[in-house]
């Protein structure tokens, strides 16, 4: 079953937002070749290793690396998380100032210490059983460890939480991540005792996979590439690459579909197309409400871009604008319509202007019902 048009459009909008924000943060000054003598001095030792031929290529490499770092930060801090929420109908949720039983806290400390010392191997089923038993004991309550689930969603019979990580997490942070996950599961087990509780750690792609197979993954290989990861985590509590994205959506091949959406938008002419569709360029505003209100050639170009970028509801909005531009509107509705068509699809801070679309469609439906 394919992703719904609504989900696809939301992914497209999020992709456009990220691309536009990256264009906004890279000035002509940022892409100039800069003087970096110390970086260059060290980098020359690696020319053969990374396939750089000369200093000119090296300076371009350093400049691109700085920009790429910013893109990686944007993807890790917002894009992956927002796409996960779109696919799962979930949200980010923080838990603090809560209480757990002392017996639970002691059990978590025991599990963590045993994993650290190597006295036990990670086993998610055994750990869950021990946590359930600890929550059922008669024990005083103590403060729990604050935690945030990057993705949280809840069904009738289960609670699912996911910690989204970069594919190269910092060495030494695995112990803390495991501890946080155990606290999160224990708290949910006590507050929602009749529901199954899952807390995964998720990675958006597998960097150890062959680039010719971007959606593929080898969980064992990936886990072994991270310092102390297998020491604390059972592979059953890890979601990676296609496995993660399809789990979130409930549909197969979701990662490929996400990449297809990105690839349809992220092209060299992105900025040119964005600037064209961000307003309604096909309207001849000095000829509104006449047969010459629409520039048909520009309208076709506008619609082609919306179709290519999978902005399905904006296609309906554009059709409504075309119809309304030819109608005899009341003076009050004219004022509303004229203000709406001078709004942008994306604001200066790159926020999608859904209100513009909704108000235009509302006005259109009002006249179509007459």
Swiss-Prot record:
Name the job this protein performs: A P subtype restriction enzyme that recognizes the double-stranded sequence 5'-GGNCC-3'; the cleavage site is unknown.
Q: Which domain of life is it from?
A: Archaea
| Cited Pfam families | RE_TdeIII
The record lists the catalysed reaction(s) as: Endonucleolytic cleavage of DNA to give specific double-stranded fragments with terminal 5'-phosphates
Listed name of the protein: Type II restriction enzyme MjaII
Q: What is its EC number?
A: 3.1.21.4
- An example of a Gene Ontology BP annotation on this entry? DNA restriction-modification system
Listed GO MF terms: DNA binding; type II site-specific deoxyribonuclease activity
Q: Which family does it belong to?
A: Belongs to the TdeIII type II restriction endonuclease family.
């Amino acid at each position: 079953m394919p992703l719904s048009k609504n989900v696809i459009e939301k992914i497209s909008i999020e992709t456009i937002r990220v691309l536009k924000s990256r264009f906004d943060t890279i000035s002509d000054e940022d892409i100039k070749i800069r003087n970096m003598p110390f970086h260059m001095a060290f980098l020359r030792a690696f020319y053969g290793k990374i396939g750089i031929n000369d200093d000119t290529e090296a300076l371009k490499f350093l400049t691109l690396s700085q920009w790429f770092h910013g893109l990686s930060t944007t993807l890790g801090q917002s894009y992956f998380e927002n796409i996960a929420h779109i696919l799962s109908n979930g949200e980010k949720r923080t838990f603090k100032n809560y209480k757990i039983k002392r017996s639970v806290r002691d059990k978590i400390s025991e599990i963590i210490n045993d994993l650290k010392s190597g006295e036990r191997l990670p086993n998610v089923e055994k750990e869950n059983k021990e946590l359930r038993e600890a929550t059922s004991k008669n024990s005083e309550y103590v403060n729990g460890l604050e935690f945030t689930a990057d993705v949280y969603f809840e069904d009738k019979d289960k609670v699912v939480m996911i910690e989204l990580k970069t594919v190269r997490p910092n060495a030494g942070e695995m112990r803390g991540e495991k501890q946080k996950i155990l606290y999160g599961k224990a708290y949910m087990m006590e507050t929602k005792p009749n529901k199954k509780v899952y807390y995964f750690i998720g990675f958006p792609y597998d960097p150890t996979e062959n680039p010719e197979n971007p959606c593929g993954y080898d969980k064992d290989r990936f886990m072994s590439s991270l310092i102390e990861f297998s020491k604390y985590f059972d592979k059953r509590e890890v979601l990676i690459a296609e496995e993660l994205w399809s789990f979130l959506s409930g549909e197969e091949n979701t990662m490929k579909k996400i990449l297809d959406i990105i690839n349809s938008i992220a092209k060299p002419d992105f900025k040119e197309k964005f600037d064209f569709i961000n307003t309604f360029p096909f309207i001849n505003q000095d000829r509104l409400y006449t047969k010459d209100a629409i520039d048909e050639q520009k309208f076709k170009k506008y619609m082609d871009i919306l179709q290519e970028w999978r902005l399905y509801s904006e296609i309906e909005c554009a059709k409504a604008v075309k119809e309304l531009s030819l109608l005899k509107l009341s003076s009050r509705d004219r004022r509303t319509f004229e203000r709406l068509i001078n709004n942008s699809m994306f604001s200066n801070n790159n926020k999608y202007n859904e209100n513009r679309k909704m108000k235009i469609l509302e006005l259109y439906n009002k006249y179509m019902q007459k």
